């Protein structure tokens, strides 16, 4: 059964227990990797900090503990870190009900979650679903703890054999051929050249890039596509590009630009 409530006085001890079980270096490393990516492309900032929000919140606690030796009241009573506190309580709840072997496997999964945002979203969804049923007073068995079944959760007391729950996390990229990070990385590469060009513009310019399926995954091909797009912007004309891609542009009215500010 996952934790469904906590007292603020428990926060410092809970964070220390989580750091001891999982290792603070995992969320510290996750934050460091995102910040490195952001330094190379500032357009990734909002996206990566949102995707790894739990890691950022836990790393904030890590820094506070390193500085003060504990988590001050002003920090653990800040709503901005509540999601990470819920995550902490839920993870510790699973570990408390695990055998040594099961706990070792779960710790590995939590550590891996800080390496990939998709894994972190999936883990949080399972914890959230388990907490939902626990708040309703039902007993929840986690198959990753009991090592039974092919489902994520078993909610006992519903139906003759309980309710099997399979959790599927759906991100904002679901159904999109071009994922947001790919688009932001491509725009970051374009901006290195477009920023200088934009300074000489005397009117607005809207540019639309169309690709047949997805942006190239190969670094060299993506760089070549970026150069072609920049060349079209310089000439101010659209054209069909290699690989089935195409660029078209049109004047953007100043009134529209004012609305975007």
Feature-to-residue mapping (PLM):
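Metal-dependent nuclease catalytic core centered on acidic motifs
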Residues: 2-13, 23, 46, 72-96, ...
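Acidic-basic catalytic patches of nuclease active cores, encompassing PD-(D/E)XK
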Residues: 107-141, 191-210
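Interdomain/boundary linker segments immediately adjacent to catalytic/signaling cores
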Residues: 21, 26-123
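Short acidic/polar capping segments at secondary-structure boundaries
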Residues: 119, 144-148, 170-172
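A short acidic/basic microdomain associated with nuclease active sites
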Residues: 135-156
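Enriched - but not universal
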Residues: 29-35, 145, 190, 194
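Conserved catalytic cores of phosphodiester-cleaving nucleases, focusing on short active-site segments
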Residues: 133, 153-155, 161-169
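Gly/lys/ser-thr-rich phosphate-binding loops in alpha/beta enzymes
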Residues: 1-17, 131, 142, 148
